Amino acid sequence: MAETQVRNFNINFGPQHPAAHGVLRLVLELDGEVVERVDPHIGLLHRGTEKLMEAKTYLQALPYLDRLDYVAPMNQEHAYALAVERLLGIDVPKRGQLIRVLYSEIGRILNHLLNVTTQAMDVGALTPPLWGFEEREKLMVFYERACGARMHAAYFRPGGVHQDLPDQLVEDIGKWIDPFFNTLNNLDDLITPNRIFKQRNVDIGVVKLEDAWAWGFSGVMVRGSGAAWDLRKSQPYECYNEMEFDIPIGKNGDCYDRYLIRMEEMRQSARIMRQCVDLLLGKERVGPVSNADNKIVPPKRGEMKRSMEALIHHFKLYTEGYHVPAGEVYAAVEAPKGEFGVFLVSDGSNKPYRCKLRAPGFAHLQAMDFLCRGHMLADVSAILGSLDIVFGEVDR
């Protein structure tokens, strides 16, 4: 009897797979149930964001940033606003900085709650997402009360934030923090010691530190491998250098370590939020929330009713926009998924000449083949969950 040639088996994972978190398509080459090769096919959500931004004024380009990592929108706006501010050479008043930091940390918790609970769901735990989404709903309401939108906020503007927060809202955010620790402890008790969750995540998708640097990882992916690299501490922006918080780091670099770091980061974010709330209700209770330069920040409604000059400024800002001095700048923030950077090139006009977006998820997804080789097919979704990928920013 003639021998039959045994070939590896190719399957498609996605593009509409429940564990793929969006429009991911992986072409997997399997030897039995062991993964030999992973080929991510991206671009299914490509919208040409970077090109579209070149046709808009600096203010009009801002909402595109919300639509990248749409799980934590304000963190992307933050990087863009910082880049424009550096080119313009303007600074943000203290109250505006505190509001930005407060909402950036809310974004981090929004992101980690979604990731940790869906990571648990990917390996078969159905309760955590229900608990996580209950807390996310409350945070979305805080987003809505600040700017009117639950997701695409367009709240951070170059020069500060769009409008001040009412005291009642800041108080409500303060009241939310302590009960949130209870929710986190409940999640912790449910998932962390769970035997099945551990078996599915411990020693899966291990990344050594030198590999993490070589692949261009950032955020949790680097901290899970043992480096205390967090832009909020290593290259502080806004008022992070005045905040007290710790950077959790892992030592095994596996999926379980990355999960534990995200859990601890939510606690640290809540600590930062508590400090912001205390300052916003105390020492910084009154004060401007955006730069006073009316050539960049539009005047207030009441001012426009009284002053013709203010009306003209407002009209010019929303039709022509402001001209940014020629130059180039790179601004990066510690977004929930890693280092989100904006490389902005200005030619002196009212529109960006080029805006390159450095999405952390893009660098993490490219290592999918490296991470999954030799693992079982079932581990692919566990590894994917621990990478924390959102396709808005990968495909741009």
Curated annotation (Swiss-Prot):
It holds the Pfam family Complex1_49kDa. One of its GO terms (cellular component) is plasma membrane. It is a peripheral membrane protein. Keywords: Cell inner membrane, Cell membrane, Membrane, NAD, Quinone, Translocase, Transport, Ubiquinone. InterPro entries: NADH_Q_OxRdtase_suD, NADH_UbQ_OxRdtase_49kDa_CS, NDH1_su_D/H, NiFe-Hase_large. It is found in: Cell inner membrane. Its EC number is 7.1.1.-. PROSITE patterns: COMPLEX1_49K. Its main location: membrane. It comes from the Bacteria. GO terms for molecular function: NAD binding; NADH:ubiquinone reductase (non-electrogenic) activity; quinone binding. It catalyses: a quinone + NADH + 5 H(+)(in) = a quinol + NAD(+) + 4 H(+)(out). NDH-1 is composed of 14 different subunits. Subunits NuoB, C, D, E, F, and G constitute the peripheral sector of the complex. NCBIfam families: NuoD (TIGR01962), PRK06075.1 (NF004739). Belongs to the complex I 49 kDa subunit family. NDH-1 shuttles electrons from NADH, via FMN and iron-sulfur (Fe-S) centers, to quinones in the respiratory chain. The immediate electron acceptor for the enzyme in this species is believed to be ubiquinone. Couples the redox reaction to proton translocation (for every two electrons transferred, four hydrogen ions are translocated across the cytoplasmic membrane), and thus conserves the redox energy in a proton gradient. This is NADH-quinone oxidoreductase subunit D. It comes from Brucella anthropi (strain ATCC 49188 / DSM 6882 / CCUG 24695 / JCM 21032 / LMG 3331 / NBRC 15819 / NCTC 12168 / Alc 37).
